[in-house]
């Protein structure tokens, strides 16, 4: 290290209290040529990035306007900008922006030069405004003859993003597995509408990336202009970027190759949006002169959390061989809690948190936003303040919630034909649209079921079903029947669960997810004696979710999805709903990404980490997450079960391949094997009941039956 470099680091340590480790220092000093900086959780990534940029300007004399830092989100760009201003207040600002912002600059400049009028189609979904969602809703209805649900619309939007970010040609649009009827035709019409359905060209955010890449490919003058604009590029969170984003950056740095890519393939969790972590694994093939640095020292978490997390992530094969470590001392042991039933989970968490004086650094993490609703209800009743990080929770406007409310509204007034029209298809009375239209032509002066029986032509089998439903509604007293009892009528007497099953089979919905919504409503119903109070409570919770997102008070508990938690840290972290089918999901092909998602969750914790599962979800038996079991076995390998646990076939298949050891005869003392969690090891001893293995982390003992039945061991490659 020369005098200038030494002076820079000494001054920053003195003025900022920032002292970099050897790898961080290398990353700061490596300014020319391609650099891949693989940053494990809590490794001081942002500090290193800011110090690197500051070093280039202060020590090397690089003009700040010649540096471009590209981030994953607007929030990240803002955070970087603020951090840079704090570290280097005397320096001019650097250009921190998202890749979409960079792409839009290129597109806007080109279209304006060509005199082409354009508009952005991503505006909010307001009446009278041409928006992406509104256009897609209309196209879906035209092609399918029915309205699109919010779930389907979300899937459709994700599908379009995936197609464009992957740069898939039209003949490959059908490849993506999305359960939206006529998805390809919808996308074709959507693209046509943007070109011809308005007095100007319409562009969405994904178009910006494709169009910018296309402009760079076809217009050498524009590409040369942007190449001259910046001498140094830095991309953050690059494990979350897609082929089209990589292509854009590759074109811009092709001449000077001064590219610093900051990423962690172990935290790649956005493949469903088109992200490709394989780009990181192939970085040296793309840039043969690249230097790869591993920032693996974790400054965030206790050794009690870091060491098991490091072992856990090594089960993945698509990764660099890096070992996360920490010099932090051990703290509280990781807690594993399996409750008797799902309906006890929210109360259990309230009991854990209600006596804490400082809750501001506590987070509850979950896979799906539906998991937040029982927590909101329980926290509000217990007077625990909370902050919803995710701004959009569609639970309260979900069509299943709306169905349930309409069944209840019909109980208030069985003469209401308008409400009946919304649910008649979903109560298994086999009423046809023609019969419904005939009912609508009658005056609203009698019970809809009586009107059907007396004034509408029915098939011979229909009166029996209609009379049965009428009898149930006659037994319901709106101001006395509890919402819990009403939900039982809806689910079973009206056959709503059967309806959900049929809809899932025909329209591609996830049946378990739909039932989860009904189950959550059941939890809320337990605390409301009347249907009127139940409806009021739902509205209250909806408003609470909205206001809690806007008001992040200092002592509030954070509720957030695992995806949204990336980049955050909390003193206390609780991962909930850890069961098979939720985490990991039921898609076997995505097991490595599911593993990474779990890894992201556990590495948010600083001192206290608790994993929570349950044996039953109401009356249905469920299986605790195999990830939870795996981590527990890492933490406490001596705590062997008395017999091999029963796991679903799905979980078994996730481990098995042609090298999986399934017979005791293949367990040979002295042979090298690979444990799916602990990695390479050597067999030291084998008995009929146990097997002893030596790993880099020490000697471990397992049940022989467990290893064989679960497929935990593999033979080593020759």
Where are these regions (language model features)?
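Conserved helicase NTPase motor core
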Residues: 8-9, 18-29, 33-41, 95, ...
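Conserved helicase core region in the C-terminal RecA-like lobe
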Residues: 97-105, 234-237, 262, 533-589, ...
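Accessory C-terminal helicase-associated subdomains
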Residues: 455-564, 585, 608-612
């Amino acid at each position: 290290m020369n005098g200038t470099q030494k002076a820079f680091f000494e001054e920053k340590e003195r003025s900022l209290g920032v002292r970099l480790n050897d790898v961080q220092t290398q990353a700061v000093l490596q300014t020319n040529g391609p650099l891949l900086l693989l940053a494990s959780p809590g490794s001081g990534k942002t500090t290193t990035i800011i110090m690197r940029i500051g070093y280039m300007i202060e020590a090397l004399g690089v003009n700040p306007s010649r540096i471009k830092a590209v981030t994953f989100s607007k929030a990240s760009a803002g955070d970087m900008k603020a951090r840079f201003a704090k570290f280097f207040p005397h320096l001019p600002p650097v250009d921190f922006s998202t890749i979409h912002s960079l792409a839009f600059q290129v597109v806007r400049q080109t279209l304006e030069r060509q005199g082409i009028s354009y508009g952005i189609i991503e505006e909010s979904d307001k009446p009278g405004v041409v928006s992406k969602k509104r256009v897609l809703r209309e196209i879906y209805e035209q092609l399918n003859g029915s309205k699109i649900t919010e779930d389907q619309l979300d899937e459709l939007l994700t599908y379009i993003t995936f197609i464009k970010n992957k740069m898939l040609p039209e003949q490959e649009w059908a490849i993506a597995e999305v359960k939206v009827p006529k998805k390809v035709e919808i996308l074709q019409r959507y693209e046509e509408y943007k070109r011809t359905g308005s007095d100007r060209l319409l562009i969405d955010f994904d178009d910006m990336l494709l169009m910018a890449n296309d402009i760079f490919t076809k217009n050498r003058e524009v590409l040369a202009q942007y190449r001259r604009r910046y001498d140094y590029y830095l991309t953050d969170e690059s494990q979350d970027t897609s082929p089209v984003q990589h292509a854009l950056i590759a074109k811009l740095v092709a001449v000077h190759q001064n590219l610093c890519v900051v990423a962690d393939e172990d935290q790649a969790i956005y493949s469903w949006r088109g992200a490709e972590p394989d780009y990181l694994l192939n970085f040296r093939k793309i840039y043969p002169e690249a230097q790869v640095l591993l920032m693996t020292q974790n400054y965030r978490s206790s050794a009690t959390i870091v060491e098991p997390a490091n072992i856990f992530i090594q089960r993945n094969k698509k990764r660099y061989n890096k070992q996360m470590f920490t010099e932090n001392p051990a703290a509280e042991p990781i807690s594993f809690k399996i409750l008797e039933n799902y309906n006890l989970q929210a109360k259990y968490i309230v009991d854990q948190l209600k006596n804490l004086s400082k809750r501001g650094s506590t987070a509850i993490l979950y896979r799906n936003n539906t998991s937040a609703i029982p927590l909101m209800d329980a926290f509000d009743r217990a007077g625990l303040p909370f902050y919803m990080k995710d701004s959009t929770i569609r639970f309260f406007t979900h069509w299943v919630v709306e169905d349930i409310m309409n069944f209840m509204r019909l109980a208030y007034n069985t003469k209401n034909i308008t409400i009946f029209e919304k649910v008649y298809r979903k109560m298994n009375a086999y009423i046809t649209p023609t019969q419904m239209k005939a009912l609508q032509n009658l005056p609203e002066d009698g019970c809809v079921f009586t009107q059907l029986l007396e004034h509408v032509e029915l098939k011979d089998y229909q009166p029996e079903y209609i009379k049965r439903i009428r009898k149930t509604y006659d037994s319901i007293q709106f101001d006395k029947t509890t919402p819990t009892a009403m939900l039982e009528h809806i689910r079973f007497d009206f056959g709503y669960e059967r309806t959900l099953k049929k809809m899932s089979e025909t329209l591609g919905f996830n049946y378990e997810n739909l039932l989860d919504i009904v189950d959550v409503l059941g939890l809320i119903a337990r605390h409301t004696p009347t249907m009127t109070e139940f409806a009021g409570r739902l509205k209250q919770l909806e408003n609470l979710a909205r206001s809690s997102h806007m008001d992040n008070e200092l002592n509030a508990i954070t509720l957030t999805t695992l995806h949204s938690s990336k980049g955050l840290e909390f003193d206390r972290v609780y991962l909930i709903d850890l069961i098979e089918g939720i985490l990991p999901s039921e898609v076997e092909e995505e097991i490595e990404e599911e593993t990474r998602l779990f890894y992201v969750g556990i590495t948010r914790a600083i001192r206290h980490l608790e994993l929570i599962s349950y044996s039953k979800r109401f009356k249905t038996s469920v299986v605790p997450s195999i990830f939870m079991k795996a981590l527990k076995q890492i933490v406490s390998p001596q705590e062997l079960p008395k017999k091999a646990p029963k796991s679903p076939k799905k979980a078994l298949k996730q481990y098995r391949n042609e090298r999986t050891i399934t017979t005791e005869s293949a367990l040979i003392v002295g042979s090298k094997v690979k444990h799916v969690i602990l990695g390479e090891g050597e067999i030291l001893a084998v008995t009929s009941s146990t097997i002893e293995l030596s790993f880099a982390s020490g000697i471990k003992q397992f049940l022989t039956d467990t290893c064989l039945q679960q497929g935990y061991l593999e033979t080593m490659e020759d």
